[in-house]
Amino acid sequence: MTAISPFYYHKSISAFLKEDESAIFSALEIADDHADVKATQRDVWVDEVLILKKELSGFTGDIIFEYSIPRLGKRIDVVVLIKGIIFVLEFKGGCSKINRSSREQVWDYALDLKYFHEASLFAPIVPMLVPFGACKSELEIERSKYHDQVYEPIILKKNEIAAAVRKFLEKEHSASPLNGFLWAKSRYSPTPTIIQAATELYRGHNVKSITRKGATGKSLERTTRAVLEVIRDAKKKNEKCICFVTGVPGAGKTLIGLNVAIQQNAIAKNISGEKAVYLSGNQPLVEVLSEALARDQYNREIVLKKNLFEKVDRKSGEKSRKKGYTLAEARIAVHSFIQIVHHYRKVMLAKLKHPFGDALEIDTRNCVKSEKDGYAEVDRIAIFDEAQRAWTCNELAGWLKRKKRLTGFKWSEPEFLIWSMDQHPGWAVIICLVGGGQEINRGEAGISEWIKAINKSFPKWKVYIPEELFNKDFSDKEAKSELSACKSKKLLPNLHLTATMRSFRAKKLSAFVDSLLNMDTKCAIKTFKEIRAQKYEIVLTRDIKKAKDWLCQRARGSERFGLMASSRALRLRPLAVDVKHKASVVHWFLDDIKDIRSSVFLEDVTTEFDVQGLELDWGCVVWDGDLIYNNKGWIQRNFKGNKWQKNGDHWNRRYQINAYRVLLTRSRQGMVICVPKGDDNDPTRKTSFYDSTYKYLKSLGMMEI
């Protein structure tokens, strides 16, 4: 077995039954590189091997221990292949009562194999939970109610495995045989959520191991290498440079930013001032990612038994238990490289001399100059996600006037951020991750403002750009003009991401949503048929309860689902959908059914501002009277006081359409769109506000539930 093998041990069942237990334990120990947990793990393996040697006697097939599921950052205890059926076994030591999370865990393993493991695509998969202690078993087995042949988890006593296997063999007698060797080596092509991907990168896995093989994985890997090379070159030549990374929607630009930050910080672990910081103006994304990484790090420390240690009082010699690594410490560690851009900007603004003159000046009375970093912040590499959303001069000046009572600010946010990094003596690097097509706020400067700032104020900075910015498909004429005037630019390959990784079931979901919102009915009908053929579900209802029931019936394991609506959807309150109530995005995205703030509790609703950049498995979009279908074009409205008013502002109309674009592209596996019936007794919820939209959506081919 090689170091990159996806499993620790694989043999035919007959070979496993004949092999000496000590040889099996030795093979497992050699494969396991976690030396500090081997003693505990060995005891578990001893129990598993002894149980399975007894229970699998008389069967033919294959057995695999510790099969890796990179997307989830876990390993399946045991996979058994018998007559075309995949049995996924998860053993629980010392447990007599199985909780919800244990069921979700083994179900997640089975679903992950079904979705992303090629050799498992057409095979029945049976998740089994086997507590070592006494338990109430579930030997009454019904045929899988799901079209993909993944069974619900069953709980078995350790001496009931053989009996359960026989029952499943009777039910699935027509299953096609599986070649054990080919199955174990089969291609695993995951499409992780951004939360899952970020967590695995933070754990030390590379981007290649956690993303879909082929175009997506290769594209991400090439771009990461290209950006790291820019950083190395800047350091070597003691230069300042700005590097632009572009990509199609859902191509993984955020993942590139996080990957570069994590890899650069690993390279510069013991080198002060050479670390990278990932900065985003998307506060919900930063909050959710930061908390997810911190929780995962903290939980792994507990698993490794480093969370508690003995403290000896020097005077008395008495021993006491002291809390070790805390969640607060984990959060601080994550915050060191993932931050909200507004906080970074605020720190640098505080260093400026007031009132503002014709040039930005440091107020030397209020800050100390570092010998190594000058007046800059400590990080020499700043990664700005969604860089096109940085504010124009008018927007930033207006904010400073309203919030800080500071007037006369003459610089755009891109120019100010470049100036901030220019305070470093020697080299510095800015990475701009640039997307497009989902503007939901006014005052966004776009890529042109970054180039304009370089041309105007920082001509010595080198500019690295992807060749695609000069393609005819790139529509930003102002940016093209600024780039043409830029004397320090250099075109680099591999700075543009071309393959989407957003939905593993419907690669054309974005195209469908575009045609739906553009009212291109013919194209929408055609694209809808294509995504339905890919088993991506979109259904329609007028009943919020039916919508919630549909979500609960579709979600399996720990798959996330929840309610979403436009931030302008103010007349959904009679349905108990209140967008004015601010959801706690961290709890909404990360917590389970036990927390009423969780998405899966189906009480709190999120808006486009909460979910942009994040994903659900299954979503419900509740459609209000803020966007009404009319065959001459969308009727767009804002709710003011006690009535709806037409939205006539060009940019606000664009943001409103894009709000629905964001909401309709958040669900990875399927969604239900709920268009309420309305109530003619309520002048703000007339049935006419909803009927035309419902009929339009239904005409595209959506099934009504």
Give residue spans per PLM region.
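Conserved lysine of the Walker
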Residues: 253
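N-terminal pre-P-loop "Q-motif" helix
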Residues: 211-241
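Conserved helicase/translocase motor-coupling segment
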Residues: 257, 440-444, 468-625, 629
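Signature of the SF2 helicase/ATPase Hel1-core->accessory helical subdomain module
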Residues: 383-481
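Conserved RecA-like ASCE ATPase "motif II neighborhood" in helicase/translocase motors
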Residues: 321-421, 603-607
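Accessory nucleic-acid engagement/destabilization modules that flank
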Residues: 1-190
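Hydrophobic anchor at the beta1->P-loop junction of P-loop NTPases
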Residues: 245
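C-terminal accessory regions
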Residues: 429, 601-705
